[in-house]
Amino acid sequence: MRSLLVGLALLSGCNLVKGPPRDHECRATLRTIIGHEDAFFSRAQRYSVHPAEVGFAPSTGNRYLYLFAPKGDLTRRDELPSPPLEESVGYGPDTRKRGVLLEDVLTRLPADLRALAGLEGECPRCELTVLCAGNLDDDPDLDVWSISTKDRAEAPRGTPIHHLRDL
């Protein structure tokens, strides 16, 4: 019976070995970021576009760009210099492990999506949107998600939205 179930799972395309899909990192990390931002807001009555201020840093080997504001310097994950953490508005992908350059992701990120990132309104009546962008295969197109502290037409607060689907 067990071999029949495993056979059916394999025929259906079920992935029992590889683990979660590659886009899971992005969605899970965006939810973690909103958790950090909500905790920071409860203490400071504001959100921050500086990941270090809210206690966020992606794990080693991250595939994605995490963008907290449409403009500003980003923390690099390679040998090139980065801004001081307190000035950074995001993190680039881990170039050492993934071979993806921050500039490659930034140049392919559509301007209208990049403009979604950042603060909206005056705190404490403000909202924050954070982007996650990366290329999961070897074509020029990106996958882009966002998460926000506000309710949006496509999803309630704290729920990632997939804006560009590359796969």
What does each of the following model-derived ranges do?
Residues 1-12:
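Sec-dependent bacterial lipoprotein signal peptides
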Residues 11-36, 41:
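Amphipathic alpha-helical segments typified by the pilin-like N-terminal helix
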